[in-house]
């Protein structure tokens, strides 16, 4: 799915690409892959890295293109493992800014709605990255509460039964916590690397930066 947004006191959906708009692509088709690689000409290695479900948060620059990968939480269709985390890539150069995810997420669509409701401006590409990191921390917390509820239920069931299935259910749910903690740690390291980019230091919104640091 491909969507374009322009910044106007919040992110407003538009029909086609314009310079400096935000292009969001989720679960890219072959047509969208060709659009990214041939029309927008992002590095193919960046595309492949984002596609790797185990890719860690990081920042990389190649031929003027910047790739930033963060991890965000998503719901799973697996009843035993209800939540996990996925990589989201932000790729930008000049007038082009793209987010790419190979999984459908609640977070990105909610982020668009939130910016419109609160009239939030996106100043530049790094401002978008920081706001997405902040949004991800909110979703981690939201899902963490649900994980804790499921753990409590599994513990209660385990107290009532000594069946191996109940223990396995608890262990599986606790895996969600491991996924969350590993991804949050990776996002925190990513944030500190972004902070150390000399060319961007004077452009950062210090209040936003502090908010992200606190939430992560």
Tell what function each PLM region has.
Residues 1-215:
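Peripheral, non-transmembrane regulatory/ligand-interaction domains of membrane transport proteins
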